[in-house]
From Swiss-Prot:
GO terms for biological process: sodium-dependent phosphate transport. It is found in: Cell inner membrane. GO terms for molecular function: sodium:phosphate symporter activity. The chain crosses the membrane at residues 1-21, 48-68, 76-96, 99-119, 134-154, 175-195, 196-216, 240-260, 274-294. Pfam families: Na_Pi_cotrans. Might be involved in phosphate export. It comes from Escherichia coli O157:H7. This is Putative inorganic phosphate export protein YjbB. It comes from the Bacteria. SUPFAM superfamilies: PhoU-like. The gene is yjbB. The lineage of its organism: Bacteria, Pseudomonadati, Pseudomonadota, Gammaproteobacteria, Enterobacterales.
Length: 543
C-alpha cells in the first residue's frame, strides 16, 4: 500500500511541477507567447513550429492548447490554424518527454536550490518567476526519478505481474488501458514513463508497450475533452479536433504494432529507450501526416459542435476564460477585453440618451436593458478578477488589475447615471409636454458630443496605456468642466431674461449639467491611472 502511495505521490509531484513551470513561464513571457501564437497562424509550417516551441517552453501541451482555445473563443484565430498549433504542441510535449527522461538527476537539486533562492528573495519580480520555473523543472526531474523508484517494487509483486501478463495480444484493450493510465495520472508523460519502466523490468512485452503509448496519447486527448466539457463551443471544437486526430492516428497505426515492434526490436537499444523514441516519432509522423487535413477537420468539428443559441438577448461575458486564471497576463487581457465591451454598451447608452433628449421616449426601455447588460458584465469581471491570486501578481499586474476594476466600476456607475437621466427627461420633460429651449438644447448637444468623444478616448487610453493620449484626455476633461460651467451661467442668464422654456425645464436642465459633469469625471479618471499623478483640481469635481 505504501509503495502504491509513493507512486501516486510521485505522479502528483510530476503534474504539480509541470503546473509550476507553466505558471512561471506564462507570468514572465505570457504576453510574448500570445504574440508569437497569434502571429504564427498565417502559415501552417510557422504555426506548427510555434506550437512545438511554445510547448517546449511551458512544458505542457495543455497550456499551449489553453492559449489557442482562448484566441479561438475570442475570434482572434480561426479553428484550422488553431488545430495546426495544437498538432505542433503534441510534437513539442513528446520531444520534451525525450529530454526529461535523460539521466538529469544531478540537475534536480541544483534547480530547486537556485529556484527557491530567487523565488523567495524576489517573489514578485521577473527573477522570482524564473526561480519558480527552476523549482518546477527540478520537481519534474525529481518526480521522474521517484516514479522509477516507486515502480520497481510494484513490478516485482506477483499479483502485478499476473495482471500485466494478461496484456498480450488484444491491441484495442491494451490501448484503452494506456488511455486509462494517462487519464488517471493526468499526464501522458507519466503514463509513457511508467510504460517504459514496466518494459525495462520485463513485466510487459514490447508490442504491449507500444499499444500503451498509443493509448496514452489518446488518453491525453480524452483528458482535454473532459477538461473543456463545460467550456464554450469554440473551446470544445479545438479539443474535439485534437482528440479526433489522435483517434485517427491510433486506428491507423494499431494494426501495424506487431510489425513495428519486430522492426524496432532489431535495434541495439534498451527496450525502455525504444519506447520513448517511439513516443516521439509516432507523434511527429502522426502530426505531420494530419497537417493537410486540418481544414476538413475544422469544418467537421463546426458541424458536430454548433454555436449555442442565445435563449435571451441579454449581453453575456464572452472573454472571461476560467482556464486562464492561473496565467495573470492572459486573464488580465481577457478582463480588459470584457471591459471594452462595457465601453461599447456605454456608447450605445450615450447615443440613446441623446435621442431621449430630442424627444424619443421609446429609447428609455432600451437604455434600461443596456444598463442591466452593463451590470451583468461588471459583476462577471469583478468575480473573475477576484478569483485571481492577487498576492502572487507582479507590481505591473497588480496595477493593471486595479485599473480594470476601477474602469469597469466607473462605467457601471455611469450607466446608472445615464439610466436615471433618461428617466428624469421622460418624466419631467416629455410626459409634461415641456421642451428645452433652443439654445439650451444646443448646449446639451455640445456637451453630449464632447462627453462621447471623451468616452471613446478614455477606452483607448484604458486599453493602450498611451501617456500622450492620457494627457490629451486630461486636458479634454478640464475643457469639458469649463464648458459645462459656461453653459450653467448661460442657462441662468436665460432665466433672468424670463425665457419660458428655460424656466419650465430649469431644474431638469441644471440636473443634466451636473450629471454630465459626473459622467465626464468617471470617464476621464483612467487618465490619472496611466499618468500616475494626482490632479490638483480633482477635489473640485463632482462624483
Amino acid at each position: 500500500m505504501l509503495t502504491l502511495l509513493n507512486l501516486l505521490s510521485a505522479v502528483a509531484l510530476l503534474v504539480w511541477g509541470t503546473h509550476i513551470v507553466r505558471t512561471g513561464v506564462m507570468r514572465v513571457f505570457g504576453a510574448r507567447l500570445r504574440t508569437v501564437l497569434s502571429r504564427s497562424v498565417e502559415k501552417k509550417p510557422l504555426a506548427f513550429c510555434a506550437g512545438i516551441g511554445v510547448t517546449a517552453l511551458v512544458q505542457s501541451s495543455n497550456a499551449t492548447t489553453m492559449l489557442v482555445t482562448s484566441f479561438v473563443a475570442q475570434d482572434l484565430v480561426a479553428l484550422a490554424p488553431a488545430l495546426v498549433i495544437v498538432l505542433g504542441a503534441d510534437v513539442g510535449t513528446a520531444l520534451m518527454a525525450r529530454i526529461l527522461t535523460f539521466d538529469l538527476s544531478w540537475l534536480s537539486p541544483l534547480l530547486i536550490f537556485i529556484g527557491v533562492i530567487f523565488f523567495l528573495g524576489r517573489k514578485q519580480s521577473r527573477a522570482g518567476q524564473l526561480g519558480r520555473v527552476g523549482i518546477g523543472l527540478g520537481l519534474i526531474l525529481l518526480a521522474l526519478e521517484l516514479i522509477v523508484q516507486a515502480v520497481t517494487p510494484i513490478t516485482q509483486a506477483n499479483g502485478v505481474q499476473v495482471i500485466f501478463a494478461s496484456l498480450t495480444g488484444d491491441i484495442l484493450l491494451d490501448a484503452l488501458i494506456g488511455a486509462m493510465f494517462a487519464i488517471i495520472s493526468y499526464s501522458s508523460l507519466a503514463a509513457v514513463l511508467l510504460t517504459a519502466t514496466l518494459t525495462a523490468a520485463g513485466i510487459i512485452s514490447f508490442p504491449v508497450a507500444l499499444c500503451l503509448v498509443i493509448g496514452a496519447n489518446l488518453g491525453s486527448g480524452l483528458l482535454a475533452m473532459l477538461n473543456n466539457s463545460a467550456a464554450n463551443a469554440a473551446a470544445r471544437r479545438v479539443a474535439l479536433g485534437s482528440l479526433l486526430f489522435k483517434l485517427v492516428g491510433s486506428l491507423i497505426i494499431l494494426p501495424f504494432v506487431h510489425l513495428l515492434a519486430e522492426t524496432m526490436g532489431k535495434l541495439s537499444l534498451p527496450k525502455a529507450e525504444l519506447v520513448i523514441y517511439f513516443h516521439v516519432f509516432y507523434n511527429l509522423v502522426r502530426c505531420l501526416a494530419m497537417l493537410p487535413f486540418v481544414d476538413p477537420m475544422a469544418r467537421f468539428c463546426k458541424t458536430i459542435i454548433r454555436d449555442e443559441p442565445e435563449l435571451d438577448t441579454q449581453l453575456r461575458p464572452k472573454h472571461l476564460d476560467v482556464s486562464a486564471l492561473d496565467t495573470p497576463t492572459l486573464a488580465l487581457a481577457n478582463a480588459a477585453r470584457e471591459t471594452l465591451r462595457i465601453g461599447d454598451a456605454m456608447e450605445q447608452m450615450m447615443e440613446g440618451l441623446n435621442k431621449v433628449m430630442h424627444g424619443e421616449p421609446r429609447q428609455e426601455k432600451e437604455l434600461r436593458k443596456l444598463a442591466d447588460d452593463i451590470n451583468v458584465l461588471y459583476t462577471a469581471i469583478k468575480l473573475y478578477l477576484a478569483r485571481m491570486p492577487k498576492e502572487e501578481l507582479a507590481e505591473e499586474e497588480s496595477r493593471r488589475w486595479a485599473e480594470i476594476i476601477e474602469m469597469s466600476l466607473n462605467l457601471e456607475q455611469a450607466s446608472d447615471i445615464v439610466e436615471r437621466m433618461s428617466s428624469e427627461i421622460a418624466d419631467k420633460s416629455l410626459a409634461a409636454r415641456r421642451a428645452f429651449s433652443l439654445d439650451g438644447l444646443k448646449e446639451l448637444d455640445a456637451l453630449y458630443e464632447q462627453l462621447l468623444s471623451n468616452l471613446k478616448l478614455a477606452m483607448s487610453v484604458f486599453f493602450s496605456g498611451d501617456v500622450t493620449s492620457a494627457r490629451r484626455l486630461r486636458r479634454s476633461k478640464h475643457r469639458f468642466r469649463i464648458l459645462n460651467r459656461r453653459y450653467s451661467h448661460a442657462h441662468v442668464d436665460r432665466l433672468h431674461q424670463q425665457n419660458v422654456q428655460s424656466i419650465e425645464t430649469s431644474s431638469l436642465h441644471l440636473g443634466l449639467l451636473g450629471d454630465m459633469q459626473r459622467l465626464n469625471s468617471l470617464f476621464c479618471s483612467v487618465a490619472y491611472s496611466v499618468l500616475e499623478q494626482p490632479d490638483e483640481d480633482e477635489g473640485r469635481d463632482e462624483y
